[in-house]
Amino acid sequence: MEYDDKLVRFRQGHLNPFDKQGEAERQPAACETEPSKDFPTSSPLSVPEFHCPDRVMDLGVSEDHFSRPVGLFLASDIQQLRQAIEECKQEILELPEHSDRQKDAVVRLIHLRLKLQELNDPLEDEPNLRILLEHRFYKEKSKSVKHLCDKCSTFIWGLIQTWYTCTGCSYRCHSKCLNLITKPCVRSKVSHQAEYELSICPEAGLDSQDYRCAECRTPISLRSVPSEARQCDYTGQYYCISCHWNDIAVIPARAIHNWDFEPHKVSRCSMRYLALMLGRPVLKLREINPLLFNYVEELVEIRKLRQDILLMKPYFITCKEAMEARLLLQLQDRQHFVENDDMYSLQDLLDISSGRLGCSLTEIHTTFAKHIKLDCERCQAKGFVCELCKEGDILFPFDSHTSVCQDCAAVFHRDCYYDNSTSCPRCTRLNLRKQVQNPGEEP
């Protein structure tokens, strides 16, 4: 009898997880059942509790497969957001007009309303897509690649965890971290405000940041208490260890002012921004640092090659063979080279410094010149004959030994043009023709 009593008590304490009917009879409120009074908490027969998120994170398993349905969280979040919006409105009305605190409150109100709108919108037809704060998150299918979550800074175990990547800025995070993201996609900043910080490490000090991380506002200090402060060499601001992983990148201001391409430590946000801006031609070197051309010979060579390519472009646009051969597509990676000669991207400066751009651009320049001067009879027919010396060789405006009249675009030998710089025969002829056609007009 004593053994039977122990067996009954054992069965009462250790429930069969697959015996749903018996469990429903014994536990009418399975989600929030108070511990039995018959068995104290310290009793070895008590049912163990497994609701310990800290322990789960220690094991590296951050997915909660026993959480409540998404709809329950959604309703709660919408109610909290509406309450926060009303409180933010009241705060804006109470703050002084045009104050910094009021401006910050307005920005916070905008983000709250955007978040509420995102929750109210119906779900996408494609379940693998999530749109948050202009991020376009796609569910990753890779199970073997291991990355770090940009939000919680822990490993993403693709075999047992669901994770997403933003197609705009390559932001990676767990599925559970999606709703915790507060930073908009940096691609929106690149689209609306495509410019660099041109001051070298513009530091303002931790006091200007209220001793908080510039991105997530976590308290930080240079003494690592409560958290280590890490400086971003691009923005000059300080960040916590979750927002600054000691990534390194080339700083545009150092490259332009010092011709220094040594990578420096930057925050995660700055690294993503610099990566997106790397190929954008937003640097006008003549205005930012015109003296750079006096000290960097490679820049002068590249500028001459680009000027020649712009002079070749009209020949290709009006040449059927060149259009069929798609010669201009050889510069499709640097489209700005066929549009202007003074805009550069940071990638251009990197390639100039390493010598790669000079070699590749010289080959393209040779191919273009060969088509115009040797391969294509139509392009050859558009050449010029020097009207000053009357020699028979055909001249083109991109030849190194020629000069071009600024008024009529006629091409002459450089020596002939400078020896007779007082007058251009073609300009004189055109002026006489105008006088004959319009005798009443003054030349």
UniProtKB/Swiss-Prot annotation:
GO terms for biological process: lysosome localization; positive regulation of bone resorption; positive regulation of ruffle assembly. Gene3D superfamilies: 3.30.60.20. GO terms for molecular function: zinc ion binding. Belongs to the DEF8 family. It holds the Pfam family C1_1. Disulfide bonds: none annotated. Positively regulates lysosome peripheral distribution and ruffled border formation in osteoclasts. Involved in bone resorption. Residues 14-44 are annotated as: Disordered. InterPro entries: C1-like_sf, DEF8, DEF8_C1, Multihaem_cyt_sf, PE/DAG-bd, RH_dom. A zinc finger (Phorbol-ester/DAG-type) spans 134-185, 364-424. This is Differentially expressed in FDCP 8 homolog. The keyword Zinc-finger applies. Keywords: Metal-binding, Repeat, Zinc, Zinc-finger.
